């Protein structure tokens, strides 16, 4: 590979002194609320992105002011589990140190803050550190937050799966001390020139972000096939014995560039649970060595597997681990939604799943959600578990505490509102006004849009039938729209591409149905399709399966060939 062809980010990483760059100098510069262009790429590895309020861009430009810069900081919380004490600290930071005054639960089981001024970044990171939380590798060309099924019913199996997710997260952390030096005031360690400080990642880390998930069938709330690397738990009784390993998934694409496409992961076979770390490291290092470092649009693992071929990639994994894959075990992949309300676990404790619209934990008129979770955290003796559907589980509630927890949840509007199956299965990304990549609204618009879709379902007599609907402001796919039965991907303000045909379970992608259309046409198209579905569907047939069977869209079986074809 010619060095001249490398993407600019590769040079930035090489010259960054293991992710230090000039971040410290930028942090100390008060004349601007921004970091330098190069450091804006490096700070992602530390867990945050530079943003600005796009609603105010033109106004500030007219006033000859720089954009209203702020930062989005994302925490690393493997499996989405945190203690009530940690949640209280998270809440306090949101209230005192961010302009958004809210906490955003993400589609990868963690939380993020919006509206952080540069001067508050260090304080926030230090406050999180005091609670054993951090933002290391929450963004950047590294392994991101590892997801794990927060199954509140099979508690023993969940704990075993969570232990592996936590191991995967801890073992794939960058080794650089840059985070501790810059944000926690640790002294810079003296290293010998050429010393290997990143045994897994190397000096230039991965070509692009890398996402892992651990699923516990039949639940697929983590959307395991949309990840770069997925481990599907195989149990004997209530004991975790191994995983079906899948690799090569990813949602991101670019409008108008057919060389880019979303993809679901391939099934590679069965591995023993104790070998999962070896296999994870093998897949990551192959991607490190083989991945595209010239064109970042083609640098995810999915493109590496397509380029080299499944069998070649599989053989390389087996060569690096010294272990052969066994035939995949039969497992049932089912629902991707959360189990709302109270569920009792095998340990007799109770778990309360709360629907959080858009994942936005904020006090709203008549619904002080943030205060409600704060008050619950003050008395709760179990865990808080964030889900990949942007919701919250109050987990491990003793029977004696159940009534008090429910009373608080109802008092603060966390319970009591009727949630349809469709709304409960649907998610949206943040998009405007903070995301620099957004072409259209998502989080702010999505609830009202869903209300109109629900009205159409009611009209055609199947409001009780859940449909997975997802909306993003751009095709990068943070809310996994290409794995939704109805996917809406922003193309321009007020305009979206409409995708149809994914399976309800997340085992088939959708396909473009209409391009660059506004709300009225979207609803008109859905009205017609819903009428056909209501009269023509087979027993138990989901909407996504119907659109493929009836020929509304063709099935996407091989994304590289079928998604755009």
Curated annotation (Swiss-Prot):
HAMAP family, alphabetized: CysI (MF_01540)
PROSITE patterns tied to this protein: NIR_SIR (PS00365)
Entry GO terms, CC: sulfite reductase complex (NADPH)
Keyword 4Fe-4S in record: yes
Pathway terms, separated by semicolons: Sulfur metabolism; hydrogen sulfide biosynthesis; hydrogen sulfide from sulfite (NADPH route): step 1/1
Catalytic activity, as annotated: hydrogen sulfide + 3 NADP(+) + 3 H2O = sulfite + 3 NADPH + 4 H(+)
Quaternary structure annotation from Swiss-Prot or TrEMBL: Alpha(8)-beta(8). The alpha component is a flavoprotein, the beta component is a hemoprotein.
Keywords: 4Fe-4S, Amino-acid biosynthesis, Cysteine biosynthesis, Heme, Iron, Iron-sulfur, Metal-binding, NADP, Oxidoreductase
InterPro entries noted in UniProt: CysI, NiRdtase/SiRdtase_haem-b_fer, Nit/Sulf_reduc_fer-like_dom_sf, NO2/SO3_Rdtase_4Fe4S_dom, NO2/SO3_Rdtase_4Fe4S_prot, NO2/SO3_Rdtase_4Fe4S_sf, NO2/SO3_Rdtase_FeS/sirohaem_BS
EC number annotated for this UniProt entry: 1.8.1.2
Single GO MF descriptor: metal ion binding
Name this polypeptide is given: Sulfite reductase [NADPH] hemoprotein beta-component
Species, as recorded: Shewanella halifaxensis (strain HAW-EB4)
